[in-house]
């Protein structure tokens, strides 16, 4: 059993297990029980993590580059709400490949709230609308993650839990200041 959610983590664990088996063949003393315990207790805050904001359920993921966005989009396929409109709250640093990330994440019915990464230069909604004219109508802007969440709550919390992603700094900030609570 693996303590980390998601197919990518299962693939990573398989690679780690193969490396551990190879190490054991070189006379390293690593028991099967130690390997099982290590995998079961693995925990990565901010990676496909269920959280709560004012009692409302949401998911956070630190996906901050195109390969991570591809994996997050792939992971979405296994969610019960996979075919439902997804609300994204995305904060992406200015030096990152935000248009490529949004092309991976957004489906036609989705909406993305673009928020700044606290304390960092970030992509804004106007830049992304220029870079992605076909998705421009799907992009909204908020000053903070909290403001975007307030808007969602005022409109009626979405059926599919919103996903906060795009920056490990944002996730760290939200966890550190207590905006989000772990489930």
Describe every region a protein language model picked out.
Residues 1-111:
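Nucleotide phosphate-binding/pyrophosphate-handling subdomain across enzymes
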Residues 84, 144-147, 179:
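Residue-identity detector for threonine
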Residues 57-60, 99-161:
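C-terminal helical cap/extension that packs against the catalytic core
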Residues 170-172:
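Short, active-site-adjacent cap segments at secondary-structure transitions
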Residues 23-24, 76, 80, 132, ...:
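Active-site catalytic pocket residues across diverse enzymes, especially alpha/beta-hydrolases
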Residues 167:
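Active-site-proximal loop/hinge segments that shape catalytic or ion-binding/gating pockets
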């Amino acid at each position: 059993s693996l303590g980390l959610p998601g197919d990518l983590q299962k693939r990573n664990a398989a690679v780690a297990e193969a490396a551990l088996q190879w190490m054991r063949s070189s006379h390293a003393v690593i028991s099967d029980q130690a390997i099982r315990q290590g995998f079961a207790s693995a925990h990565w805050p901010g990676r496909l993590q269920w959280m709560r904001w004012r009692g409302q359920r949401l998911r956070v993921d630190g996906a901050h580059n195109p390969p991570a966005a591809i994996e997050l989009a792939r992971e979405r396929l296994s969610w019960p709400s996979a075919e439902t409109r997804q609300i994204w709250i995305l904060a992406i640093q200015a030096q990152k490949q935000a248009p490529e990330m949004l092309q991976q994440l957004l489906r036609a019915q989705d909406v993305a709230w673009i928020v700044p990464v606290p304390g960092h230069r970030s992509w804004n909604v106007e830049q992304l609308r220029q870079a992605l004219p076909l998705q421009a109508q799907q992009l909204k802007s908020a000053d903070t993650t909290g403001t975007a969440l307030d808007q969602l709550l005022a409109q009626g919390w979405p059926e599919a839990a919103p996903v906060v992603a795009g920056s490990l700094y944002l996730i760290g900030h939200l966890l550190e200041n207590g905006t989000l609570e772990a489930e």
